[in-house]
Amino acid sequence: MKRKIFYSHKEELWNAWSHSGGIVLGIVFGTIFLVWCFQERAGWATAGVILYLVGMLFSYVSSTVYHALSARSVWKERLRKWDHAAIYWHIAGSYSPITLTVLRNQGAWGWGLFSFVWLCAILGTISSLRKLRDHSNLETLTFIGMGLSVLVAFKPLADSLPISSIIWIVAEGVMYITGALFYSLNKRRYRSEERRVGKE
């Protein structure tokens, strides 16, 4: 008989606490960056940081609440959809500071990349809320594609930023891609366990 495989209580608590730590760090560093932007009267930088904070906090808050809920809660499945949708916002938000500042005056690179990642975020949110599967290759590929999209503007970025900033941007993209791949492999493992249990 087929049965649903859930994360253990300890795994869910760890996920909830780790993501709540992201909320705290996001608020602390976000406040520091916003204060700097206001002091410098950098309007575009302020907009970029705000979008980044919205995406990051949306991701961490929804994930914290989702993992903190009991598996029997009627809200668990609803929060799972928002948890997935928030990942798109987190990635798009990460691109906002560089596209609205460094790349904004580099021809079509800034607004083109900004429009692309936020369009992906909007479409991804709609897809997640309408019909979210336990595992979706399209979702995983979209996460990876958004993470790699910075490569199309790598030349103007390299011409405008110091090497230390480039390293941070590349590292962030690698983290997104690695996270998406691990998430995909983990879901495949649970799906194979479900099929095995269903045959017993």
For each feature predicted by the language model, list its residue ranges:
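Multi-pass alpha-helical transmembrane bundles in non-GPCR membrane proteins
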Residues: M1-E193
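Conserved small/polar residues in nucleotide/adenosyl-binding loops
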Residues: E194-E200
